[in-house]
Amino acid sequence: MASSAPAWVPYEPTRDCSQGLCSMYCPQWCYFIFPPPPPFDVAGTSADDSSGPVFSPLVIAIIGVLASAFLLVSYYTFISKYCGTVSSLRGRVFGSSSGGAAYGGGAGSGGRHGHGQSRSHESWNVSPPSGLDETLINKITVCKYRRGDGFVHTTDCSVCLGEFSDGESLRLLPRCSHAFHQQCIDTWLKSHSNCPLCRANITFVTVGLASPEPEGCAPGETGGDNTHEVVVVMDGLENLCEEQQEAVSRASTADDDHDAKDVAEGMEEANGAAEIREEGSPPKRGASSFDLHRDNRMCIADVLQESMEDELTAARESGLLAGGAGTSRRCHGENSKGRGGRSRRALQLQDAMEALPGKRLPSGGRSCFSSKSGRGKDSDHPM
């Protein structure tokens, strides 16, 4: 049995292995039998893990800060754009609706009129999209600045931030009364329709001047082109009859100059005014018609003041002051029988006016008288 075992070749170590005579016991060929041991890793990590990218905490922090900043900027841009679009759209809608209610001239009816009226109170806070015309800008009040006069409360212009100097032309806006340099505010109003300081809209309300038609005056027929109509507007019709009746009674019982002076003083205590307007054509509506009526208007006391002293002097010299008043009253008493429909108050008013025509009438109510130039007698005086 022992002889059948293979005999091993004795190992003879040689240091020169290049000749190929090395045996299997040579350390160079040991890897054919056993695999080589793994290499020793000092860091404790495998070769696969060490081959991947390594991120430091500083890089991660920088990336996080940049991402947060980007998100905040994007959010701010989106919100500002969205909110600005909504606010401008809302302003246009509210501005158009309130402007239509203010300048529509009553196009809506019923509840829609009340809704437009409520919107008109808020319309001055909404900025219109366009500016004003040059004609409207020129209608705004222009004044000269004087330091210390109290007319302009501010001392500088809010547009150019420059101070006002004496003699400069300033514009006062109609609603808020803020003052600005004329050139500065004109440039601003060409692209804006509101005040640059308080944002109040600059609105112009056109008020039509209607021709003053006296109350209580019955419409009469026109006699042609030569019709001359005189309208007397009197104030104080309520207390006029009693005072005029008292004055006439004083005049009828006065026998000397002292009584005549008392009558004159009693009539002047009325403290009234009457206005007379002469109209040669039907009144036209507008500012020109208003100026025409104002030019043709005069006070009865101013017209008859000059003849007052002459009439009193003539009455005292002739001694017919009391008799004249009584005769006037009797004549009107006889004529009153044929005046169907006239009131007692109108007769007393006419008697008092004819007795002392130079006196002023008290203030209070309103009445009117109209007469035609082609009539010989006084026309009826509707009350």
UniProtKB/Swiss-Prot annotation:
ZnF (RING-type) ranges: 157-199
Name of this chain's protein: E3 ubiquitin-protein ligase Os04g0590900
GO biological process: protein ubiquitination
The species this protein was found in: Oryza sativa subsp. japonica
Catalytic activity: S-ubiquitinyl-[E2 ubiquitin-conjugating enzyme]-L-cysteine + [acceptor protein]-L-lysine = [E2 ubiquitin-conjugating enzyme]-L-cysteine + N(6)-ubiquitinyl-[acceptor protein]-L-lysine
Stretches for region Disordered: 105-129, 269-291, 320-383
Residue ranges of the TM segments: 53-73
SUPFAM superfamilies: RING/U-box
This protein's UniProt keywords: Membrane, Metal-binding, Transferase, Transmembrane, Transmembrane helix, Ubl conjugation pathway, Zinc, Zinc-finger
